[in-house]
Amino acid sequence: MTPDNSLGPEFVARLANGGFAETMSEDQRAAIHIRTQLDGFLKDCLDSGKQVVLTGNPGDGKTQYILMQQRRHGAPDDAYYLPDASAESDYLKVLDEWKTALDKERPGILAINEGPLYEMLTQHQSDYDFLDTVADQLDSQIVLNEATAPRFDDDEIVVLNLNHRNVLSRPIALQAIQKLTTEVDINPDQDDGHIESNVAKLQNETVQENFKRIFRMLGKLETHVTIRDLLNFLAYCLTGGRAESQSDPGEELKYYNLAYTGRGTLFELFRQYVDPEDLTHPFVDSMLWSRAEREIAPRDVDDARAEIRSQYVQLKRQFLFEDQAMDLGYSSKSLYYDVDYDFLELRNEDSGTQEDLENLLRRINGYFADSRKMTYELQLWFSHKYIGRSTKAILTRHSVSKSDFEIRRPKLNPSIEDAMEYIPDSAVLEYTAGETPVRLEVTRSLY
């Protein structure tokens, strides 16, 4: 069946409902393709004769990147492409074809989800020498010490785990918004339906900037967001999953309400971390509540409190994106700029200061006892069994100086750091005075 080539509301609604690269025409794939540093990295690998293994989760964009490289002008004529090895039932057939391509020194890209790749390695690594390289690189994607990290610049195979890619960066978010509002056949000046209205709003620079800020904040969380999640979210914000634009739409079809009503990873993140009732600001909340009261204009405020509250929530959602137009004298980022700030600063800074280390030791010590003064050493606590029975009592007799610890930040292996942006989901406290390092992963919940 020939795919529908249209780029109108039907196409965007299909994106909102999960239709992606495998079922799109070439024109549609090109229209929504978000160019990132990964495009250039893949091009360089192919042009230098390497094979790339793209792995990760469903929706990470593996198939899309292969299809775009295939149609690229100047792509190697003899390149070997396998858009979805995960769908193959016979791994041996895949591996034999792959080995043949390697033996003939053909460049190429193979896409396979992370689970099937581990299964392939478990079952067949001993039978194919090149799978040793794949396994080593898969285990070395993230490193703590660049100086001692294994390098694979000279390998004929390059493994990229897109599970580590941050797709909520400003450049990617802006491209995604612009692709879905300017590269599609939806003209806000031709109709006044909900789709055209939402497209016009998302073409506004202030709205785009606030989307980028919120995405950037959400991108620092532990939850992995795929490129499919991002496009699905934005397409739903524009259409509500409807292919036909509804004239004179109600509030439920405004983009700032649709951002909270869809299904998927980004919608869950919005509901959990960008809840208007959780992100409070005394002056903003007061002014928006007063505005809600005026718009509802009840005779009895107490009787209309639920209606006023509903209107207030909608105004608060609108303010998150249209703060300048609403002219309250405050920026919407003042509502969420300090969410988990201390942990994010510890996790994302390139190098740990002595102050960071002391603060972290104080927090860990505080798990067992008052730690306001315990910043220069880590107390070691023990529990004992008496006559074979456990006791709830714990005691400390030893401590370790802070000079024996370092804070490490996970980073991409230097061999692939040019392929994508990575934001770690934790920091690491490392004991460095022993023959082998002992590490404690410091997650948001532990911190």
What are these regions (language model features)?
Residues 1-10:
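Interdomain "pre-motor" coupling segment immediately N-terminal to P-loop NTPase/helicase cores
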Residues 47-48, 103-106, 187-188:
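Short loop/turn elements that form and flank the Walker-type P-loop nucleotide-binding site
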Residues 66-73:
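A conserved segment at the C-terminal end of the G1
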Residues 45-66:
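Walker A/P-loop nucleotide-binding motif
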